[in-house]
From Swiss-Prot:
Name the UniProt record assigns to this protein: NAD(P)H-quinone oxidoreductase subunit 4L, chloroplastic
Enzyme Commission designation: 7.1.1.-
Keyword Zinc: no
Transmembrane segments: 1-21, 29-49, 63-83
Annotated GO MF terms: oxidoreductase activity, acting on NAD(P)H, quinone or similar compound as acceptor; quinone binding
Function (record text): NDH shuttles electrons from NAD(P)H:plastoquinone, via FMN and iron-sulfur (Fe-S) centers, to quinones in the photosynthetic chain and possibly in a chloroplast respiratory chain. The immediate electron acceptor for the enzyme in this species is believed to be plastoquinone. Couples the redox reaction to proton translocation, and thus conserves the redox energy in a proton gradient.
Pfam families assigned to the protein according to its UniProt record, in alphabetical order: Oxidored_q2
A GO CC term attached to the entry: NADH dehydrogenase complex
Broad class of enzyme this protein falls into: translocase
Domain of life: Eukaryota
Species per Swiss-Prot/TrEMBL record: Angiopteris evecta (Mule's foot fern)
Source lineage: Eukaryota, Viridiplantae, Streptophyta, Embryophyta, Tracheophyta
Compartments reported by the entry: Plastid, Chloroplast thylakoid membrane
Annotated GO biological process: ATP synthesis coupled electron transport; photosynthesis, light reaction
Length: 100
């Protein structure tokens, strides 16, 4: 059981990491980042159930990561919306907002 959950977590992490590196769209990159967070949450819960069955530290930490990821997604989508309104594009390679 633990092997299947860890393989699923590693598979989701690799898909998210590959998508984050190769993505040229900001929304797709944000979705891949959320996929990475979910893979990490699966590993937290799996290791918590395997090593410490009495205390639920992994589940509590996983819930806090979900809350932080939801806030990150809301802020990220609002920033993407503002950039889209100004530049009419969400492609990452077209932006040089940090350059003078």
């Amino acid at each position: 059981m633990i092997e299947n959950a860890l393989i699923l977590g590693a598979y989701l992490f690799c898909i998210g990491f590959y998508g984050l590196i190769t993505s040229r769209n900001m929304i797709r990159a944000l979705m891949c980042l959320e996929l990475i967070f979910n893979a990490v949450n699966i590993n937290f819960v799996t290791f918590s159930n395997y090593f410490d069955t009495q205390e639920r530290k992994g589940e509590i930490f996983s819930i806090s990561v979900i809350a932080i990821a939801a806030a990150e997604a809301a802020i990220g989508l609002s920033i993407i919306l503002i950039i889209y309104r100004n530049r009419k594009s969400t492609r990452i390679d077209q932006f040089n907002l940090l350059k003078w």
